[in-house]
């Protein structure tokens, strides 16, 4: 795994989130009006809170859309977590021309959800998977 560098803005967002939720954050990415938090394994419940109270409180404080991804040391599990509610049939990771590529099998009815508006979901997945598991590309099948 490559070293993750955080901007001072990200460090502030992490400190705010951790102080408001008691969840531990592994990474933070600020991207186009949204903040993506990678939550340590097992802390997702604390991050969300009862009835979503914690995440809603953080959202009001930062005035941006908040997305949470639960971290996993296992790349396949992490990729599934990064896709959120999308049903993933399978994930295969292989080397192609010297690059690590994850092939994600998604049902055709959920492919649009996996891609997201203007490709925002697939780009998010590619970004976090690259940062945490050195996977160069994610391809939907």
Sequence positions of predicted segments:
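RNA-contacting regions in translation and RNA-metabolism proteins
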Residues: 1-141
């Amino acid at each position: 795994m490559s070293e993750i560098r955080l901007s001072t803005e990200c460090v502030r967002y992490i400190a705010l989130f951790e102080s408001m939720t008691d969840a531990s954050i592994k990474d933070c990415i600020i991207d186009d009006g949204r903040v993506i938090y990678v939550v340590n394994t097992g802390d997702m419940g604390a991050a969300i809170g009862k009835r979503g109270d914690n995440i809603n409180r953080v959202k009001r404080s930062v005035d941006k859309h908040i997305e949470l991804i639960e971290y996993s040391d296992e790349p396949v599990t992490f990729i599934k977590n990064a896709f959120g509610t999308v049903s993933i049939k399978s994930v295969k990771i292989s080397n192609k021309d010297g690059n690590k590529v994850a092939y994600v099998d998604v049902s055709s009815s959920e492919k649009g959800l996996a891609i997201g508006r203007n490709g925002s979901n697939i780009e998010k997945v590619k970004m976090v998977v690259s940062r945490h598991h050195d996977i160069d590309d994610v391809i939907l099948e």
